[in-house]
Design a protein with these regions (language model features):
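ATP-dependent adenylate-handling active sites, centered on carboxylate activation for C-N bond formation
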Residues: 1-141, 158, 181-212
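A short, charged helix-loop
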Residues: 140-151
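Structural motif
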Residues: 31, 153-166
């Protein structure tokens, strides 16, 4: 389409030289490495424009994340009674080596969706590992955060539940915050047309899993 794209290679030295500033602009610890690339992208865009359009919200509204396919792809496995799946999940976590194919699958499906899914993010530690590391007053309690959200969509299908949780946690507290702060750090306004009210209303007309 005869489109001219600008490219920038971030050197290791640039990374380390700017890391402390990037963290300062984020205001709080955020374990999302995309913030660094977004900072440099905003820096380059700000050389030519003051306002940009971004696609934040499209994946959450229209089922763009691969993880949303999981409930649809593994319906047969999920017919196995939950007590058996829990046993398999516990066995995988305790006995199978990290990185072994199938370990993560068994661990995920050894729990209900409400127990295992809190955002479109990767766990660094299992709950058992986190319990061994953290002090007693800091035990992981993510379900205290997600339970009210799941309660609001308890009658919906699994894909819709995942999208709902992502829209209220992942999108708000990571995606939008990161885009806004990295843009503003470079005096760049980042607008998100997919989160227009009418687009949201259109997305809500989809039957569960339809977009996926």
């Amino acid at each position: 389409i005869n489109m001219k794209n600008d490219a920038k290679v971030i050197t290791p030295q640039e990374y380390w030289d700017n890391l402390s500033d990037i963290q300062y602009y984020m205001d709080e610890p955020v374990a999302d490495p995309a913030a660094i690339a977004l900072y440099f992208l905003s820096q380059e865009a700000a050389k030519k424009v003051k306002v940009v359009l971004s696609g934040e919200g499209s994946d959450e509204l229209f089922g763009g994340y691969n993880i949303y396919c999981e409930p649809l792809e593994h319906t047969s496995f999920n017919k196995i009674p939950m007590p058996i799946r829990r046993m398999l999940g516990n066995f995988a976590e305790r006995c199978l080596p990290r990185g072994m194919k199938g370990r993560g699958f068994l661990m995920r499906h050894g729990k209900t969706l409400e127990e295992r899914y809190f955002a479109n993010a990767t766990n660094i530690f299992t709950e058992r590992e986190a319990n061994r590391i953290l002090k007693k007053g800091c035990k992981p309690g993510i379900q205290k955060v997600t339970a009210p959200l799941y309660e609001r969509v308890k009658d919906k299908d699994s894909v819709t539940k995942m999208q709902y949780v992502d829209m209220h946690l992942w999108l708000v507290h990571d995606i939008l915050m990161k885009g806004d702060k990295m843009g503003m750090a470079n005096s760049l306004e980042v607008r998100v047309p997919f989160l227009d009210k009418k687009v949201l209303e259109l997305a809500q007309t989809q039957v569960g899993g339809q977009a996926v």
